[in-house]
């Protein structure tokens, strides 16, 4: 016996908010009422009006119209500067001066130990390399200042002594203790710059100081501390010459 063909409407989707199997036009949007739930006193419902139906979340051509994003047109005004406080700019210029002054002190120490009547070539090499490293730090800060749209302002460098003899300690120990105090001072100044960055909510400056300077600084302090301890053990006699030879062949700048 042949069965009459049944008339079945094509499946066109169903609503998640109606009963299961309820036929719905596929061109209509799906209801989001199944997300309207409460947990305790908190409403976790999602309104259909909050769902970006177009998929557009970021509209760059509209957002770049903000006044703070406008490109300056006045002369002598940085085009790159953004979220860079005047206090941060001043702190960087001051740190540049700190690094140059430290370099100047180390260069004077190099000249002293390189004399023909002192002739401690290892100390001379160590302090010359330290001077060059501090100068490189100053140049790195200058480059960062320009990167952020600041203006480099160089301050005067103070005169430094040229004699480092010390009756009780000897010139070698006295000079190395001076270097240790200098590295601690530079570290203190760098931490001050980091505090300025935190106070002005400048994470980029804070990251720059942390990644480029602070870790290296504590390592330098540790190394020179060891040099001071060793020089205290060897005294002012023949041991200084042996220590100088170790610096000449193995030592590196702070």
From Swiss-Prot:
UniProt-annotated location(s): Plastid, Chloroplast; Plastid
CDD domains hit by this protein: Euk_Ferritin (cd01056)
Pfam families linked to this entry: Ferritin (PF00210)
Range of the transit peptide: 1-48
Reaction(s) the record says it catalyses: 4 Fe(2+) + O2 + 4 H(+) = 4 Fe(3+) + 2 H2O
InterPro entries for this protein: Ferritin (IPR001519), Ferritin-like (IPR012347), Ferritin-like_diiron (IPR009040), Ferritin-like_SF (IPR009078), Ferritin_CS (IPR014034), Ferritin_DPS_dom (IPR008331)
Keyword hit for Secreted: no
Primary localization class, coarse: plastid
One GO term (biological process): iron ion transport
Intrachain disulfide bonds: none
Annotated Ferritin-like diiron domain residues: 82-235
Gene3D superfamilies tied to this protein: 1.20.1260.10
GO molecular function annotation: ferric iron binding; ferrous iron binding; ferroxidase activity
Binding site for Fe cation 1: 99, 134, 137
Top EC category: oxidoreductase
Residue sites binding Fe cation 2 per the record: 134, 183, 217
Keywords carried by this UniProt record: Chloroplast, Iron, Iron storage, Metal-binding, Oxidoreductase, Plastid, Transit peptide
Cellular component terms (Gene Ontology): chloroplast
Region (Extension peptide (EP)) residue spans: 49-81
Enzyme Commission number, as recorded: 1.16.3.1
Family: Belongs to the ferritin family.
Function, as annotated: Stores iron in a soluble, non-toxic, readily available form. Important for iron homeostasis. Has ferroxidase activity. Iron is taken up in the ferrous form and deposited as ferric hydroxides after oxidation.
Quaternary data: Oligomer of 24 subunits. There are two types of subunits: L (light) chain and H (heavy) chain. The major chain can be light or heavy, depending on the species and tissue type. The functional molecule forms a roughly spherical shell with a diameter of 12 nm and contains a central cavity into which the insoluble mineral iron core is deposited.
Protein name: Ferritin, chloroplastic
Native source organism of the sequence: Phaseolus vulgaris (Kidney bean)
Designated gene of the protein: PFE
């Amino acid at each position: 016996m042949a069965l009459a063909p049944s008339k079945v409407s094509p499946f066109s989707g169903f609503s998640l908010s109606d009963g299961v199997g309820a036929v719905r036009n596929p061109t209509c949007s799906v209801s989001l009422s199944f997300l309207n739930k409460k947990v305790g006193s908190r409403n976790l419902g999602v309104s259909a009006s909050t769902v970006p139906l177009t998929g557009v979340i970021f509209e760059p051509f509209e957002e770049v119209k903000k006044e703070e994003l406008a490109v300056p047109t006045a002369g002598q005004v940085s085009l790159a500067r953004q979220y860079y406080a005047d206090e941060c700019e001043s702190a960087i210029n001051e740190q540049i001066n700190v690094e140059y002054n430290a370099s100047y002190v180390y260069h004077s120490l190099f000249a002293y130990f390189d004399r023909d009547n002192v002739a401690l070539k290892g100390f001379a090499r160590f302090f010359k390399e330290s001077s060059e490293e501090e100068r490189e730090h100053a140049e790195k800060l200058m480059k960062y200042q320009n990167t952020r749209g600041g203006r480099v302002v160089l301050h005067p460098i103070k005169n430094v002594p040229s004699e480092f003899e010390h009756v009780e300690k000897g010139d070698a120990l006295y000079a190395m203790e001076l270097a240790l105090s200098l590295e601690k001072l530079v570290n203190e100044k760098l931490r001050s710059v980091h505090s300025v960055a935190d106070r002005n909510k400048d994470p980029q400056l804070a990251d720059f100081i942390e990644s480029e300077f602070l870790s290296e600084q504590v390592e330098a302090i540790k190394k020179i501390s060891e040099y001071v301890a060793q020089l205290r053990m060897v005294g002012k006699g023949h041991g200084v010459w042996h220590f100088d030879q170790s610096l000449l062949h193995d030592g590196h700048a702070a």
